[in-house]
Structures are given as C-alpha cells and as structure tokens.
Amino acid sequence: VGAGSAGCVLANRLSADPDVSVCLIEAGGKDKSLMIRMPAGVGGLIKDAGPHNWGFYTDAQKHMNNRKLWWPRGKGWGGSSSINGMVYIRGHARDYDQWRQSGLRGWGYADVLPYFRRSEGYRGKADMHHGSDGPLVVEDSPLDSIAYDSFIKSGQEAGFPYTPDFNGADQEGVGPYQRTINDGERWSTARAFLHPVLKDRPNLTVMST
C-alpha cells in the first residue's frame, strides 16, 4: 500500500510487531512542504494538480448536465489527510449499525468506537466518545469568527437542532466542528502515525519519490 491516509495507520499498527517487515510504496513525495504543514495552505493544495495532488476528475455525471467534477486527492505522505480541510468527523453511528444488521459482524458502532477512541488525542474533555491518549490530535474549532458563529445561529433559526459535538452522542444538527490541527499545524496521518515511529522501527521502510 501507499503512505496515504489509511496506509500510514496500517504501517504503524503492523510494524509494532518487530518480527514483521513493513514497506510502504508511495508514488508521491515526503510531506515537507510548508503548504502542507500550514493549515491556510489548503486552498493552494486542492486548487490544481501538482506534486501533492493527483487532480482527478470524476466521470461525466448524467444528472449534472454531464459535467465532470474536480476531485482533488492527496499524493504523498499522508495522502488526502495532507491536503484536505482538516475537519474531523466520523461516519454516522447509524451507518455502522446498518452494516452490522446487514451481516458485517464486528462493524457496529459499539464495535468501532473503541478504535476511534484509541486513535484520538482529543484536546477537549475526554468522555465515552473521545480518547485523549491517541496519536491523532483533534481539537475543537474556536468560535472566533463572526461568520462561523452566524452560520450556526442561522441553522438553529432554520430549525436544525444544535449539537456541540458531531462525533458525540448526537451527530445530526448544526454546531462547531472538530479539526486535526496540533499547535497551529496540520496533523495528518503521516504526522500522527508514521513520523513518530520511523526512527525507532528498523522494520518499517517508506519508498517514495
């Protein structure tokens, strides 16, 4: 696999066993660019195809006047977690439960929640929905923008319920989001799961351009 969003996590977990040799083969380069580390760089990263963005287009969409849609995808260490908007939001609990009801044992919300908590280093108050000791730093987005606050209030006035935590007990409604930013820098899966273990695990190798 490559060193994308999932590949970095997979490599971390597999290489924890010193008897296993793991090699990530990544088509892109290392995540050294300031534009990747700087959260404000997202606009430039997703705008055009380049060294960090594959720049895909979808197939023509019949119900969108046969338009092809721009589909930026990360290229390099961290994959799309190195170019995305850094919003941290999990799948809806009901979706996981529907998977379980369809016969996918072990994939109900109660089954996957412990793994979400294990991976998460939440900077807010840890509870049954959030973990505080994991490598993926998650923080609440500060309500320091007039536009941000007004958008939430407008949603409430339109009849949507307020939810303070989209990854908590109530996942439907309008409210502040959480983000993967650590001390002012983007916290991709490469920063969280790959970089911290590379020096100490001789059984883990990354091949990239």
Locations of regions flagged by a protein language model:
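N-terminal redox-cofactor-binding region of secreted/periplasmic oxidoreductases
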Residues: V1-T209
